[in-house]
Amino acid sequence: MNIDLLLYIVLFSQIMFVSYYYPRRLLIRIHTIFKNYPPNDFPKLYPESIDKYKKSAKRYQVMNHLIIVLGFSLILWFYVTPRTGKWDQAIVFWYFMIQFIPNLGIELWSMKYHKAMRLLNQDAQKEAVLQPRRLTDFISREFLAIVFVIYVIFVGYVAYLDQFDYPWFGGYLNVLIISGTYLFFGFIIYRAMYGKVKNPHQSYEDRKIDIQTLIRQLFSIAIAVTIYAMIQISLRAFGIEAYKAITISLYFHVIGYLSMQWPRLDFINFDVYKDKPALTK
């Protein structure tokens, strides 16, 4: 198959997956919460007006629709403009960064939402769960072993290629970058396990599920990042760099999929967001 045609197909898939399917799944989840857990019955779930949250959800949808249009325009530009392919990978990368902007907005909104919830419930008392938290409480030793083995394979692969003295090869700088990524993920995991509670109402069981989901996501992304780094190095070593833009787009598919692993709503205890009944004399 023609490389350009394959790039158009993969990029079209990236547009629809990251800017249509992913937001659609998230919006269905949000509107399901609005419908099944309304403010009148679950007032603690809404520190601000539900209309404000609905407007934010609408803005998120509109932003993604505009990014879809931009993506289709990008494919058209690829088709009609003569190019060498040298900048295709960079263009696909920066388009994904644009696709990420609405989701970054959701993350910032989530931080503001939890801050408002804490400010309104500063006197809330939560029962402490006296249980030590270890990484293996949230993820299996087998999964950790897989992550470690893939990291060791990556280090060994870099060491093997380093002996050929490729002028373009960064050598152990690649190991430093990947190791830095692992350390950054480790810092996020540490904050999640031992940091300040974001949601003052959330039950311990729900928080444990959230932490478990986050850890699985980050370790899965760490695996994806490491494998992608090996693929990119291999494409350069074997002289098939024309596929770089395609592989980075496929990589973004994987990142999008891994980011979409949310706890099921029916597993969440929403009763904690109800008003406590008044005591009768």
Feature-to-residue mapping (PLM):
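Cytosolic/matrix-facing juxtamembrane and C-terminal tails of multi-pass cellular membrane proteins
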Residues: 188-281
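N-terminal leader/presequence-like segments
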Residues: 1-86
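Short, Lys/Arg-rich cytosolic juxtamembrane segment immediately N-terminal
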Residues: 50-66, 132-141, 211-217
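Juxtamembrane inter-helical linkers in multi-pass membrane proteins
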Residues: 31-46, 115-134, 194-212, 274-281
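Alpha-helical transmembrane segments
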Residues: 2-20, 85-105, 167-187, 245-254
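Membrane-water interface of transmembrane alpha-helices
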Residues: 18-38, 100-123, 183-201, 260-270
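Internal, hydrophobic cores of structured domains that mediate oligomerization or house catalytic pockets
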Residues: 85-159
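Alpha-helical transmembrane segments and their membrane-interface junctions
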Residues: 58-85, 144-182, 222-255
